[in-house]
């Protein structure tokens, strides 16, 4: 590449989303969505049809997060001339490449709209260089703010603002600058700094930056957890092995937390499933099962096991520490109506019922099983520590009351 030749990224992203089976009825001509019909049938065989739209939405939110990360990385790169997506809609061929934010018919899939997308993919984009997305409340957030501006002409004396607020809209800190924005990227604005000591409970915060009097703005979500780890009294028995000691404790009516070690599952029980934070690239049929094999998590955010781990029903960055180092547990042999606390959304070619976290009554006791090994050293993974804290808080409360009974053999 010549020194003065513009460099543009080619077909970045290609992050997949779960199929939207409502599209099937739109194929009224010579082309039929037989692939979707097969995927729909295999989902029904696993008794998960009622979750099809939930899987679409949850995986779609992760897809949007992945595209946002890729696009912002390109816009932050000094001297970079631009980026190209394959398309905004799905590519139905080559193994079924569900990489679009839109249906093949240029219609919304319901999980992201143009207004949100334009925050990070536009001619003028605020860009935060966040060093991390998870903080403790004895830290300060410090994030440099830059702009990429590729409008028709420079912006003179732009009134730039930023704020960090909680989900209720209460502003923790804010700031402003007046800056000229030339036609380029890597335009330095200033540092966004906020002491986080006022955040006394686990919270999701929203960092926003933009230009006053315009639609130009962008936002990022961060998570803040207490630095002091709460002591758990009457903690359950915790183990990596479902051995006779664990069984005996359950038979006596105790609570047990079973954390699956990496590589501990047989292939048919999930050992051959590669879990990652991102969505599937292109599709596994075309890439010969290139990892990852999953499409993020799906959960009920109001489940009491997650009360100290703020989340939506889909993956966001607080899940990175957990799903990037976990096993997917195949639960196809469990009762048809059984649902885990936290699902891992499987590849649509296999449509297995996958669990990351699930609970059951076993013997006289109660069991919680986690596909992430929460017993090994944290090594700075504060989100994983908080996830464990939330689970233990739940298991030591009277809210821990699984409704499904499983036998030792089923476990």
Where are these regions (language model features)?
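Short alpha-beta junction capping motif
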Residues: 234-283, 364, 370, 391
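Short beta-strand elements
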Residues: 179-182, 215-231
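Catalytic beta-strand/loop cores that center a nucleophilic Ser/Cys/Thr
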Residues: 1-3, 262-267, 283-382, 399-411
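Flexible loop/turn segments at secondary-structure boundaries
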Residues: 15-17, 90-96, 171, 245, ...
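Short amphipathic C-terminal alpha-helix that caps PH/PH-like domains
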Residues: 383-396
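Beta-strand-rich binding/interaction modules
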Residues: 138-180, 189-193, 202-212
């Amino acid at each position: 590449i010549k020194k003065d030749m513009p460099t543009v990224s080619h077909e970045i992203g290609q992050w997949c989303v779960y199929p939207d089976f409502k599209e099937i009825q739109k194929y009224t001509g010579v082309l039929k969505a037989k692939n979707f019909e097969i995927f729909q049938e295999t989902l029904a065989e696993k008794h998960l049809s009622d979750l099809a739209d939930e899987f679409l939405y949850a995986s779609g939110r992760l897809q949007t997060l992945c595209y946002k990360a890729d696009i912002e990385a390109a816009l932050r790169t000094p001297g970079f001339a631009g980026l190209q997506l394959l398309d905004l809609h799905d590519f139905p061929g080559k193994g079924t490449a569900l990489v679009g934010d839109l249906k093949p018919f240029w219609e919304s899939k319901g999980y992201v709209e143009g207004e949100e997308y334009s925050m990070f993919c536009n001619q003028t984009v605020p860009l935060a260089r966040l060093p991390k997305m998870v903080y403790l409340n004895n830290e300060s957030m410090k994030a440099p703010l830059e702009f990429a501006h590729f409008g028709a002409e420079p912006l003179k004396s732009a009134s730039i603002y930023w704020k960090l607020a909680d989900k209720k809209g209460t502003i923790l800190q804010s700031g402003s600058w007046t800056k000229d924005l030339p036609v380029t990227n890597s335009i330095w604005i200033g540092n966004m700094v906020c002491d986080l000591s006022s955040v006394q409970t686990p919270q999701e915060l929203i960092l926003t930056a933009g230009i006053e009097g315009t639609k130009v703005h962008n936002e990022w979500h961060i998570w803040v957890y207490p630095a002091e780890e709460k002591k758990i009294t009457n903690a359950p028995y915790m183990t990596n092995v479902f051995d006779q000691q664990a069984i005996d404790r359950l038979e006596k009516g105790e609570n047990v937390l079973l954390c699956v070690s990496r590589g501990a599952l047989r292939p048919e029980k999930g050992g051959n499933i590669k879990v990652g934070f991102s969505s599937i690239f292109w599709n596994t049929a075309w890439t010969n099962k290139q990892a990852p094999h999953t499409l993020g998590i799906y959960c009920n955010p109001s489940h009491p096991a997650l009360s100290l781990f703020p989340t939506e029903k889909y993956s966001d960055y607080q899940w990175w520490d957990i799903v990037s180092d976990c096993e997917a547990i195949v639960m196809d042999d469990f009762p048809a109506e059984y649902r885990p606390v936290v699902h891992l959304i499987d590849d649509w070619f296999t449509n297995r019922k996958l669990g990351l976290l699930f609970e059951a009554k076993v013997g006289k006791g109660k069991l919680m099983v986690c596909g992430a090994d929460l017993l090994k050293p944290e090594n700075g993974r504060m989100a994983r520590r908080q996830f464990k804290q939330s689970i233990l808080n739940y298991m030591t409360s009277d809210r821990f009351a699984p409704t499904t009974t499983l036998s030792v053999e089923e476990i």
